[in-house]
Amino acid sequence: YAKYGLKPRVVGVFDSKGSAVDTSGLELEKLIEVKKKFGSVKNYAKTKNSMSGIDMIKNVDADVVIETTASNYKDAEPGMTHITTAMKRRMHVISVNKGPLALAFPSLMELATYNQVIFKFSGTVGGGTPILDYAKNSLRGERITSFSGILNGTTNYILTNMANGLSFDTALKDAKDKGYVEADESLDLDGLDAAAKLVILANWVMDMKVTMPDINCKGIRNVTTDDIKKAKKNNCAVKLIASCNKELIVEPKEVSVDDPLCVNGTLNAIAFTSEHSGTQTIIGKGAGGMETASSILRDLLDIRQEIAKI
């Protein structure tokens, strides 16, 4: 990223067991080695640091806070407190945690505006595939009238395997063995992950003021082999589709195999329909460590660019 004139100085990192802080800048290669060896960054310095995430945000000065804790769709914690505290301290925020946005997108945007900070979250939808940026920037000047897509790679992988002859239980086990399924499998199987991404898209792309309770959500637990066979006869495949066309819905639907949206495996795809440009489909990897890191770097560059304009 040096070619963009950006050399971030990381002054603090925390994980579930502790933290590492150095206001002059942490040595990132050493930090990674420590995490690999000990399972926590708290062993970075000779004196172990047990400072919590919220204490770090409150007491360590930084320009940007990057929030990467697990998504929680019950109360959005601890991510919600991390984000709001950072904003109140006039820190810009990058989040790949969907929970706070899914439950309180409108109020978080208002808080960012009030505190004159930049809030970026491109990694929450599509991982390394810039779905949010595409809709907001590449279709600038257009009015997007609706969109629909496959926003969860895990369920798409399971449904693809079912189309190849596996039972639901066998396909689920295979997905778990490959590490695709969330620790709380209901986030994938009941459509909650897709619903969270739908909320973020609806707010960001369509300027709707919605949260998770506004989504009519149905997962894939009740999809049977008969449903899969019936779809095949219709030259279709069953996919978990998140759609925004007046109503916000997540549900299994038959999609024609000739439709660009009908992707297989862990791929994500989304089709935006706009007033004058018709329908455009984006396909890409939905998640993964490197992909998520790529989205964070992209957001960091955007923040740098926006600050330079001020």
Question: Where in this protein do the model-derived segments appear?
Answer:
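N-terminal glycine-/serine-/threonine-rich beta1-alpha1-beta2 phosphate-ribose binding loop
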Residues: 1-88
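Conserved active-site and cofactor/substrate-binding residues in soluble primary-metabolism enzymes
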Residues: 8, 26, 60, 81, ...
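General beta-strand structural signal in soluble alpha/beta enzymes
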Residues: 13, 64-67, 94-96, 119-123, ...
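Rossmann-fold NAD(P)-binding glycine/threonine-rich loop
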Residues: 70-89, 96-136
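Rossmann-like NAD(P)H-binding beta-loop-alpha module
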Residues: 113-181, 192-193
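Substrate-binding/catalytic subdomain of NAD(P)-dependent oxidoreductase enzymes
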Residues: 161, 172-269
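ATP-dependent carboxylate/acyl-activation modules
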Residues: 259-310
